[in-house]
Amino acid sequence: MIKRALISVFDKTGILDLAKFLESRDVEIISTGGTYKHLKENGVKVIDIEEVTGFPEMLDGRVKTLNPLIHGGILAIRDNEEHMKVIEEKGIKPIDMVVVNLYPFFNKVEEDLSFDEKVEFIDIGGPTMIRAAAKNFKDVVVLTDTKDYENVINEIKENNQVNIKTRKKLAGKVFNLMSAYDAAISNFLLEEEYPEYLTLSYKKNMDLRYGENPHQAAAYYTSTVGKYPMKNFEKLNGKELSYNNIKDMDIAWKTVCEFKEVACCALKHNTPCGVAIGDTIQEVYTKAYECDPISIFGGIVAFNRKVDKETAENLIKIFLEIVVAPDFDEDALEVLKTKKNLRVIKCEEKSTQDKDMTKVDGGILVQQSDNKLLEDTKVVTEKSPTEKEMNDLIFGMKVVKYVKSNAIVVIKDGMAKGIGGGQVNRIWAAKEALDRAGDGVVLASDAFFPFGDVAEESAKWGIKAIIQPGGSIRDEESIKVCNEKGISMVFTGVRHFKH
């Protein structure tokens, strides 16, 4: 039975209802600082923690609950005679409920504050109390999440107590929270790219209907700190997002963020099927659609500019899962909303692409994101690309890095006319891209040509210029073919494998 509760919260959502309920059941309430003031001003009978400890707050509030008279009351095991004898001798009363939420370090670490100001939001007393209460969960109910208040109130109403299953779950939530909280602090202080221990701080954003396939359960977690496009987007219309939707949206958004020009990316199964740049939003959508008017069906379309009404009217002519853009004209949004299932996503954050992580069985691979497009760019053939061809070549390299290896992209006039990817050898990828393109002008490859066959195949289709990393022991074979066929070729010095 709960006779004594300690309440100290930063987030005061729902705390008055909880406190008044406890008061109605003759529970003695102890509180601190701002929480004490808030409860008292709202008519709750509350005891200042200083009356319990006999010691005032000190060090600008850094020390207020760190006291044996508090922690002894939390940690004492009620059916341990020695424990109860000791706290009675020391004048310590048991504390049966601890209601605490922490200083918002997750939020403050991203604000425009000095280092020392951010450090002040590292909570010490709160974590100490909730860890103690969680350890002694059989005797102490610990609440750290405002969403749990109602359930606990209902259990007490029905059973006059909180059952052991609920107590254990609430205790588990404490250590789950503290793992994330400590991880955020650790990463803030260490500032290491590859620390000895990899600690990640993510919070569940939403439960998903299922994962990649219907038989796979899934949920979506987002970083507790920082601003990221796949964390801070806003859904303006449509059904709930799925696991595959979020994965696809991430790649589509990263692709359009590569370009300063107006850009559009159509994507299906995590692979671009149409990418284009141009002068207007209508132009780039039309070009992206024309890249592959079959595969775009049921896919995702992303833009790096605001979507207008005319483009929206074209978008709803086909079945799409998602349209994502930095913003939408009001009349464009009204058009898109006529498709009630179409997910319309407003995403203002630019792609950060800091680290890539891949889970393997028993480990996590961590690497820098592929942010370097070119390095030692040089023309290696007798013929040089024209300025227009060079622009298309650079465009092609920005696209090919988002296509699964082996990857080839064929480009014409700022549009990816043919995309070949996910092949186990490069010539198959080249044939796929060239066949889809039909009449492309330039070709981009994510990695070097191991033989001269890709250059030979490119010549058959009238390709005028090629861009690739170079570095093969048989580079001269490809260079020779290009010189014989009148093709210019550029080496970049940077490979873009994607697996």
Curated annotation (Swiss-Prot):
EC number of the protein: 2.1.2.3, 3.5.4.10
PANTHER family associated with the record: BIFUNCTIONAL PURINE BIOSYNTHESIS PROTEIN ATIC (PTHR11692:SF0), BIFUNCTIONAL PURINE BIOSYNTHESIS PROTEIN PURH (PTHR11692)
GO biological process terms, semicolon-separated: 'de novo' IMP biosynthetic process
Residues forming coiled coils: none
Every MGS-like domain range: 1-144
Keyword Translocase carried by entry: no
NCBIfam families named in the record: PRK00881.1, purH
InterPro entries the UniProt entry points to: AICAR_Tfase_dup_dom_sf, Cytidine_deaminase-like, MGS-like_dom, MGS-like_dom_sf, PurH-like
Organismal lineage: Bacteria, Bacillati, Bacillota, Clostridia, Eubacteriales
Family as reported in the entry's similarity comment: Belongs to the PurH family.
Biological source species: Clostridium botulinum (strain Loch Maree / Type A3)
Disulfide bonds, paired cysteine numbers: none
Protein's UniProt name: Bifunctional purine biosynthesis protein PurH
Domain remark in the UniProt entry: The IMP cyclohydrolase activity resides in the N-terminal region.
Reaction catalysis annotation: (6R)-10-formyltetrahydrofolate + 5-amino-1-(5-phospho-beta-D-ribosyl)imidazole-4-carboxamide = 5-formamido-1-(5-phospho-D-ribosyl)imidazole-4-carboxamide + (6S)-5,6,7,8-tetrahydrofolate; IMP + H2O = 5-formamido-1-(5-phospho-D-ribosyl)imidazole-4-carboxamide
